[in-house]
A protein has these predicted regions:
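Transmembrane alpha-helices and adjacent helix-loop boundaries
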Residues: 1-193
Length: 193
């Protein structure tokens, strides 16, 4: 089961990285990037709510980096800092507004927010419209290290989320998933968590 899946994934990664084919390396980087998105969505599911807006926050971070790099001509590494800052602020605002809703209402709000963000990207000329933003290139010196950087980021996120899930906070998330009234009855502010 799981061990075989991990072994096959590691074999595919090694093949892609050592083949020397840029296409395979790019595919592996995209797989790791989407794995980060999948892992964060799974983490959000710990509280028992499906938050489709996770994809919107992912896109907001990507576009924040691209805008900082291409429009404002900030250095690449400074531009990378824009992603967590902008996406984090917008997600905190989104959570503050929507976390009082539950079930299908929360799902519909998160879906609507994601659609609004998508429409904003595709209809904004300064963001490239349907074609997206063009002209954001990382430093050439990093090209050979991108797979290692992607693996490191994914591993760090997996470790952080694994430890969080097994911490007291993770247990509180599971309690909220099972019955939100129980954590409230012992004085926990469910909305703040």
């Amino acid at each position: 089961g799981l061990a075989l899946s991990i072994l096959i994934a590691l074999a595919a990664i090694c093949f892609a990285l050592f083949s020397g084919e840029p296409y395979y390396v790019q595919v592996i980087i995209w797989v790791f990037t989407n794995a980060v998105l999948a892992v964060t969505l799974r983490f959000v599911l710990l509280i028992g709510e499906l938050n489709i807006a996770t994809a919107a926050f992912f896109g907001i971070g990507a576009y924040a980096t691209a805008v900082a790099s291409t429009i404002y001509d900030l250095p690449f590494f400074i531009s990378l800092l824009a992603a967590p800052i902008i996406a984090g602020l917008i997600s905190a605002l989104f959570g503050w507004v929507t976390l009082r809703t539950k079930g299908p209402y929360f799902l519909l709000i998160s879906f609507a927010f994601t659609e609004v963000v998508r429409l904003f990207y595709t209809k904004s000329e300064f963001l490239g419209g349907n074609s997206g933003m063009i002209g954001m290139f990382p430093p050439m010196a990093l090209n050979d290290y991108f797979p290692a950087i992607a693996i490191t980021i994914l591993t760090a996120i997996l470790l952080i989320l694994y430890l969080t899930e097994r911490s007291n906070l993770g247990r509180v998330f599971k309690a909220i998933q099972n019955n939100e009234d129980i954590p409230r009855s012992v004085g926990l502010n469910v909305i703040a968590l």
